[in-house]
UniProtKB/Swiss-Prot annotation:
Family: Belongs to the selenophosphate synthase 1 family. Class I subfamily.
Protein name listed in UniProt: Selenide, water dikinase
InterPro entries: PurM-like_C_dom (IPR010918), PurM-like_C_sf (IPR036676), PurM-like_N (IPR016188), PurM-like_N_sf (IPR036921), SelD_I (IPR023061), SPS/SelD (IPR004536)
Organism name: Shewanella sp. (strain W3-18-1)
Binding site for ATP: 26, 54-56, 74, 97, 145-147
GO biological process: one example: selenocysteine biosynthetic process
Annotated catalysed reactions: hydrogenselenide + ATP + H2O = selenophosphate + AMP + phosphate + 2 H(+)
Any one Gene Ontology cellular component term annotated for this protein: cytoplasm
Record-annotated active site: 23
Length: 352
């Protein structure tokens, strides 16, 4: 199957049919905490190894002493105008949660909301085909799904995966002294906002798209390194938000080398033009109290919501060389962006 975008009529731009875009649609961490607070008695299952206590990327259920099942779902509104590309990005983003736990996907089902009276069904078909393309690249079937008539376009997947329990990685199990690595550059929110504001130059139109369509398959191999102590993906809460989850879960402080954080090409140029998504401000409002004092420039980068972002890896010093060799072999530039240490201040992240 070709992954060439479908040609849309000039009058139809998917991003104009949604109030948010990609993982920037996420409900803020502060509001989400209110939603998830339950008055019901706690029901426990000893076989549920990972639930929502640590805001991890997926749930993990123990089948036996060796194998676990991973379950996750993710969906959002259009982040690009092309329907095929939108579907491909949304599916890639959902599948990557499986890799972020150290597992491999085995099947997916689609979630589709579509404004039937506003947009032709043929465009929805292209969205679903984009999802199929991502599933094919991950080696799995799009096995079914569910659709509703909705006021705005929505697409995503519920994905099932499997994992050898010895390889299971979580976001709250980092250790003091771990080094931090990021497998994709930051800046997707900035570039996609530039597109929505009609400031994105044609020659830059594929920078964010290519990053968002890259599956995090490397996660399943990273997880086999015993010295990798924690793993998560960087999505809607931005690098700072997902790093905070890692730090708070392990009671550690991150010493973040801000100047080492990799950025997508042209991200700084569009940031200078004021291309800051609303999700950036919501993110900072939600967790800024746990960060050091930041300039507006630093906020715009560290809190930039990523869609189908990369993996954040916490690796021991002893296993760092093994991780670097693996990243190099898979054409991922290994850049250490910081380390994890014993807390010395109220902030969970400090810049160095």
């Amino acid at each position: 199957m070709s992954d060439s975008p479908v040609t849309l009529p000039e009058s139809i731009k998917l991003t104009e049919y949604s109030h948010g875009a990609g993982c920037g649609c996420k409900i803020s961490p502060k509001v989400l905490s209110t939603i998830l607070a339950s008055q019901l008695p706690v029901f426990t299952d000893p076989n549920l190894l990972v639930g929502n206590q640590s805001r991890d990327d997926a749930a993990v259920y123990k089948l036996n002493d060796e194998i676990g099942i991973i379950s996750t779902t993710d969906f959002f509104m259009p982040i690009v105008d092309d329907p095929f590309t939108f579907g491909r990005i949304a599916a890639t983003n959902a599948i990557s949660d499986i890799y972020a736990m150290g597992g491999t996907p085995i099947m997916a089902i689609a979630i589709l909301g579509w404004p039937i009276n506003k947009l032709p069904a043929e465009i929805a078909q292209q969205v679903v085909d984009g999802g199929r393309q991502a599933c094919m690249e991950a080696g799995i079937m799009l096995a079914g799904g569910h659709s509703i008539d909705a006021p705005e376009p929505i697409f995503g997947l519920a994905v099932t995966g499997q994992i050898a329990l010895s390889d299971l990685k979580q976001n709250d199990t980092a250790k003091k002294g771990d080094r931090l690595y990021l497998t994709k550059p930051i800046g997707i929110g900035i570039l996609t906002t530039a597109q929505k504001q009609k400031k994105l130059h044609d020659e830059d139109s594929l920078i964010a798209v290519n990053a968002m369509c890259q599956l995090n398959t490397i996660g399943a191999t990273i997880a086999k390194i015993s010295g990798v102590n924690a793993l998560t993906d960087v999505t809607g809460f931005g690098l700072a938000g997902h790093l905070l989850e890692m730090c708070q879960g392990a009671n550690l402080t991150a010493k973040l080398k801000f100047d080492a954080v990799p950025l997508l090409p042209r991200a700084l140029d569009y940031l200078a033009l004021g291309c800051v998504p609303g999700g950036t401000h919501r993110n900072y409002d939600s967790y800024g109290e746990h960060l050091p004092e930041l300039s507006e420039h630093q906020k715009a980068i560290l809190c930039d919501p990523q869609t189908s972002g990369g993996l954040l890896v916490a690796v021991s010093a002893a296993a760092e060389a093994e991780l670097i060799a693996l990243l190099d072999a898979n054409h991922i530039t290994p850049i250490c962006i910081g380390s994890l240490e014993t807390p010395t201040t109220q902030a969970n992240v400090v810049l160095c």
